[in-house]
UniProtKB/Swiss-Prot annotation:
This is Putative dehydratase subunit MJ0007. It is a single-pass membrane protein. PANTHER family: 2-HYDROXYGLUTARYL-COA DEHYDRATASE, D-COMPONENT-RELATED, DEHYDRATASE SUBUNIT MJ0007-RELATED. Keywords: Lyase, Membrane, Transmembrane, Transmembrane helix. The keyword Transmembrane applies. It comes from Methanocaldococcus jannaschii (strain ATCC 43067 / DSM 2661 / JAL-1 / JCM 10045 / NBRC 100440).
Length: 373
């Protein structure tokens, strides 16, 4: 099957993003680095600033991080810190300030060390989901707005906020369309291509992301009309994010006869689900408050989302993916596994890191799982 032109364009845009980003900085635009899907990018864009995801998906930077951080810590946290300490991530080096958030204990404490290396602002994300917690979160988003205005010198007007809300909602709309197309049999796109799309959506200029998504949807609609695509056991991945560089599990699944048709993760549905309904700071805050991350207490809607995706995408089996020492997702995995087994949905739990040492072992386990379902 011919390669998708939109994915080739995605790779080209990613290859030239560093040069483009530094040119945008030379034009006077501020860059806000971020780690997490909870950071409301509409606020940053409304001040003509640039939100950009930060590196954290490589094993190479972990040794330098372990000079300061414990070995028994999530590899994403160590890799991120190592990239900044080693000064090898262009997005870190371009960032005028980094926005952190109180999602997990490891990141919170790592930020105390990272703020020695780069200016930081930490958003307090309440872990409860009640009205009092929502009020706290709305205030945190208002504080972010004040910070962004101060850092950029640009006033965030109602008009600019409306423009950026509409633009980011457009990205969400296009990802929804992509997921609709993935319901087809055969699947019109490989999971690895979609993973790269999510990974780079955190990095690319938003207008480039929109253009690539529009082109991709046209190509996939054509494939669906022709009945072209990828056969195999249909797999939903759920769990920890897979930031750029961390493709191991998806690669293995598709090597052994599976096809990934959905991702319930921050490099997946949590990135785009739910539109901002309205144009106020409060409306923006409410949308992000709904994100069902495992760091939240009594995160029952995540379980329901997974069951819904299994049905909508006609999934044959679920791969629950956890990074080593990610206690939040690992513990919540027990609830997810129990709920899916009650529904008769096959599930396998995988715990791994960024190294290649367990690739063959994972390949054996995933191959057996796919044969079983």
């Amino acid at each position: 099957m011919m390669k998708l032109k939109a994915i080739e364009k995605l790779m080209q845009k990613f290859a030239s993003r560093k040069e483009q980003l530094y040119k945008q900085k030379e034009e006077g635009r501020k860059v806000f680095g971020m780690f997490c899907a909870y950071v409301p990018i509409e606020i940053i864009l409304a001040a003509n600033a640039i939100p950009v995801g930060l590196c954290g998906g490589k094993n190479d930077t972990i040794p330098i991080a372990e000079e300061d951080l414990p070995r028994n810590l999530c590899p994403l946290i160590k890799s991120s810190y190592g990239f900044k300490k080693a000064k090898t991530c262009p997005y870190f080096e371009a960032s005028d300030i980094v926005i952190g958030e109180t999602t997990c204990e490891g990141k919170k404490k790592m930020f105390e060390l990272m703020e020695r290396l780069v200016p930081m602002h930490i958003m307090h994300l309440p872990h409860m989901k009640d009205e009092d917690s929502l009020k706290i979160w709305i205030k945190e988003v208002e504080k972010l707005k004040e910070l962004v205005e101060k850092e950029t010198g640009n006033k965030i007007t109602e008009e600019k906020l409306k423009e950026t809300v509409d633009k980011v909602n457009k990205v969400r709309e296009l990802f929804y369309k992509l997921y609709e197309l993935r319901k087809n049999k055969p699947a019109p796109i490989k999971g690895l291509d979609v993973l790269k799309l999510f990974q780079f959506a955190y990095l690319l200029d938003i207008d480039d992301t929109i253009g690539i998504l529009e082109d991709l949807i046209e190509e996939l609609e054509e494939r669906v009309k022709k009945g072209e695509g990828y056969e195999g056991k249909r797999i939903l991945i759920t769990g920890c994010p897979m930031v750029a560089g961390n493709n191991k599990i998806v690669e293995i699944i598709e090597e052994v006869g599976g096809v990934v048709v959905g991702e319930e993760s921050c490099t997946g549905t949590r990135f785009f689900e739910n539109f901002v309904e309205g144009y106020s700071v409060e409306d923006i805050a409410k949308r992000y408050f709904k994100i069902p991350c495992a760091c939240r207490f009594k995160n029952d809607e995540r379980v329901e989302n997974i069951k819904r995706l299994v049905k909508e995408l006609d999934v044959d089996g679920v791969v629950y993916y956890t990074l080593q020492y990610c206690h939040t997702f690992n513990i919540e995995g027990a609830k997810v596994e129990e709920a899916l087994k009650e529904e008769g949905i096959p599930i396998i739990r995988i715990e791994t890191d960024y190294s290649e040492s367990d690739r063959e072992q994972l390949k054996t386990r995933l191959e057996a799982f796919i044969e079983m379902i």
